[in-house]
A protein has these predicted regions:
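Carbohydrate-associated surface elements
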Residues: 9, 28
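Conserved donor-binding/catalytic core segment of Leloir-type glycosyltransferases
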Residues: 39-56, 62-66, 77-79
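Nucleotide-activated donor-binding/catalytic signature segment of Leloir-type glycosyltransferases, i.e.
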Residues: 88-119
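Short alpha-helical donor nucleotide-sugar binding micro-motif in glycosyltransferases
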Residues: 122-128
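Aromatic "clamp/platform" in nucleotide-sugar-dependent glycosyltransferases that forms part
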Residues: 136
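Short hydrophobic beta-strand element within catalytic cores of glycosyltransferases
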Residues: 153-157, 168-171
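A charged, aromatic-enriched C-terminal amphipathic alpha-helix characteristic of glycosyltransferases
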Residues: 189-196, 206-238
């Protein structure tokens, strides 16, 4: 019997726990995620998607953004949440008393909790310049791949990612540590490096045109490599041979 999974990282986990026959069948990207060349404008627009799941790193995104660009009109952050947003502004890192919601404290942060259909999501990606995704781990990770497919510079942890080669110079360092969310994610997690996220967000802000050109140039190749038909044919070709 075979075990099927979505990434090389997941396959290694299964193999390390005693499953010798593991097949990797990655997710693909739909053609609607068309590439768009982003150019420097008066405002650099950051995007984070993943709330309210703590594993997606939304709170770290808010902390770093407000530290670097809080209330700076040249930069904005949009958080797209599913129903609820859990990010908050705290008085400090010791007491951690809540001051309020990020969009109530900072005039350059927007939070979206409404449901979006696929076309609205594609437009949301196209309307923004940089995706910030300091995930603590994914089974595959659709959100960064969708951003990369549109040519968007993407700051993302990478050890778990099947498409890590496409994350390029904005790969975010992380450390494998014990999970702090045993109730939801027992075991190990990839904890993003806060200081490295600060460095990457600052660098992409100051050198946006260079990063935009780099990520746009590879977007067509991403669509080729993650074409659903091609991935499916590759995954099932051995099965086709057995029954043909």
């Amino acid at each position: 019997d075979d075990v099927w999974t979505t990434s090389d990282w997941c396959a290694n986990v299964f193999q390390d726990t005693g499953f010798p026959h593991v097949k990797v069948y990655p997710h693909g990207i739909d053609p609607v995620w068309v590439p768009r060349r982003r150019k420097q404008s008066d405002k650099l627009k950051f995007l984070h998607i993943g709330e309210p799941a703590p594993r997606k790193g939304g709170q770290m995104v808010v902390d770093v953004f407000t530290n670097l660009f809080g209330n700076n009109p040249d930069y904005s952050l949009t958080i797209k949440a599913y129903k609820n947003n859990t990010t908050r502004i705290y008085n400090n890192y010791i007491d951690k008393n809540i001051i309020g919601l990020p969009n109530n404290i900072y005039n350059n942060i927007k939070i979206i909790t409404e449901d979006y259909n696929e076309s609205q999501l594609v437009q949301l990606y196209h309307d923004h310049d940089v995706l910030i995704y300091p995930s603590y781990g994914e089974g595959f990770g659709f959100i960064p791949l969708q951003a990369l497919a549109t040519g968007m510079p993407t700051i993302c942890t990478y050890d778990w990612a099947h498409y890590k080669k496409y994350l390029g110079p904005l790969k975010l360092k992380s450390n494998l540590v014990n999970s702090t969310w045993d109730y939801a994610h027992p075991g190990k997690i990839f904890e993003p490096e806060y200081k490295h996220l600060v460095e990457l967000m600052r660098d992409v802000a100051y050198n946006f045109n260079a990063y935009s050109g780099y990520y746009f140039a590879q977007s067509t190749k991403i669509h080729e490599d993650y074409n659903w038909d091609q991935l499916t044919n590759n995954a099932f070709k051995d099965n086709f041979k057995k029954f043909s």
